[in-house]
Amino acid sequence: MEKNKDCADNHCMTLSPASPLLSPEEIAVRAGQQIPYLQLPARASVFAEREMRLRQRAAAHPMRDFLLFTAELAHVQHELLQSYPEVALPDAEALHAAAHAAQAPLPAAGWPRDGAWRSGFRNMLERLLPRLANSPAQAVVRALSQLSDAELEYQADCLLQNGQPDLDLAGAPLIAAALQMYWTHMVLTLQEARGTARDAPFGRTLDVTRCPCCASLPTASVARVDGSGGHYRYLHCSLCSAQWHMVRIKCSHCESTKGIHYQSLQPVTANRADSSAGGSPHEKENQPAVEAETCDECRHYLKIVRMERDISVEPVADDLASLTLDLLVSEAGFQRHGVNLMLLFGAPDSEGGAR
């Protein structure tokens, strides 16, 4: 393994080239095995699991307060999603048109949002405020609660339409949280209503780098573990939490299979000890569950969280808890492909979407 000398916060970044062998997905496809293309979130657990992982990762973490704030937000998201009101959904004609064009049926940038999402946003703030005792975030919550419908819709447009300059970065995670509830509810309700129909509401789309349900960018990819022990890579949607299959060792931005590398963080002390001893005998068992998959062709990257190394990984939580990796990979000249709506920073990517 080649050791990269970039270091930050008592961690060094290691660089591993991708294996030239066929990925398990490619082997399965060649053998005729059907891999589910789409994994939809579970209403009862999607935000609850995120909250649990955020609390787990917050322990002794430099970003403890922010991770715990995001955990409180996920708690309220979970509560409200269980009894979300009815909202307008695409009819059969609209679904057929989207399928015929190989487009997402609930596009984030163009969907006419139901006013119920604004009610959900205000209910979320009302429930969240008492959970933020003595937190600086209380001021942001109170300020957002004073937004008019027009102001709130404008901020939502800025957020969903590629991070326009007028976006309020302090309030964006809270607005995003309400939009996540709304889009997750729409996806699940539409699947429940029409999932057994001959023409399923969601399928493959032309742009495989974006969510087939809402056309949003991924937050990260996740190497899932199935019942037979297989490991399959899925991209995790930043907005609706749907996951769609993409074979491993393939760039999630340009789709190249050349020049793919995996970069990860190791404590400096352990890194030096392994180097002097020629590698730890337990190195494989101690491999980090979060890596950055980088592409030499387009100079983009996306994190991957690996369930085979830590069954508790959750893409949004583990992405937030590994920002040091983002900093080091960015310093190496790579640009992030995906987005985490809980923490927006930097300028919009040329492809669209705030980083």
Task: Enumerate the predicted regions with their spans.
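Generic recognition of cysteine residues
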Residues: 7, 12, 158, 213-214, ...
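N-terminal alpha-helical interaction blocks
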Residues: 37-198
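Short N-terminal signal/transit or membrane-insertion segments
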Residues: 14-16, 24-37, 51, 139-153, ...
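A short, highly charged, low-complexity intrinsically disordered segment
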Residues: 11, 123, 127-130, 135, ...
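A subset of signal/propeptide-processing and intrinsically disordered low-complexity segments
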Residues: 1-6, 277, 281
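Cys/His-clustered metal-coordination modules, chiefly Zn-binding fingers
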Residues: 189-274, 278-328
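Long, contiguous alpha-helical scaffold regions
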Residues: 2-94, 304-355
